[in-house]
A protein has these predicted regions:
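Short beta-strand or tight-loop elements
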Residues: 37-39, 54, 84
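Short, charged beta-turn/beta-strand-edge "cap" motif at the junction between a beta-strand
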Residues: 45-51
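Contiguous surface segments at macromolecular interaction interfaces
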Residues: 1-8, 14-20, 24-30, 66-134
Length: 134
């Protein structure tokens, strides 16, 4: 199996991921790309943070679960969506400015992070280097 690395966005004004990961290392996430079990997911917190804060691994895919059961939604309109989910398990929490949007952009990020992005080339090399040194 070929492992893919992704950056995915999380808007902390819509979903309280920090609280969710305080209570458990596992979180259900919208399956809006072709994630496979074993893929690595770097979670980028947008508004107010603008940096990668978490590294997770996909442990299950194609899950049907009601978002209403998730108490960490701030934006209740998003909570009501019925979407396929994946189960992510947190591997690491980052507390470094080295994974900020500006430095990601300087190291190969070509666009804003509004959806899943496959890590490739110089951006992948940069994120992996910071990850290994944290």
């Amino acid at each position: 199996m070929n492992q893919t690395e992704w950056i995915i966005p999380c808007n902390p004004q819509s979903y309280n991921l920090q609280a969710a990961l305080t209570n458990s290392d596992e979180v259900y996430w919208r399956q809006n790309a072709r994630y496979e079990i074993g893929d690595i997911i770097y979670i980028y917190l947008s508004k107010g943070v603008s940096a990668i804060r978490y590294k997770a691994i996909v442990i299950r895919t194609d899950i049907e679960i009601k978002s209403e059961d998730d108490p960490y939604w701030i934006d209740k309109t998003m909570q009501s969506q019925k979407l396929q989910k994946v189960l992510l398990k947190r591997i690491k929490t980052f507390n470094t400015a080295l994974l900020s949007y500006d430095l990601l952009k300087e190291n190969g990020l070509k666009s804003t992070i509004q959806g899943p992005i496959k890590l490739k080339g110089s951006l992948r090399d940069y994120v992996n280097r910071i990850d290994q040194n944290q």
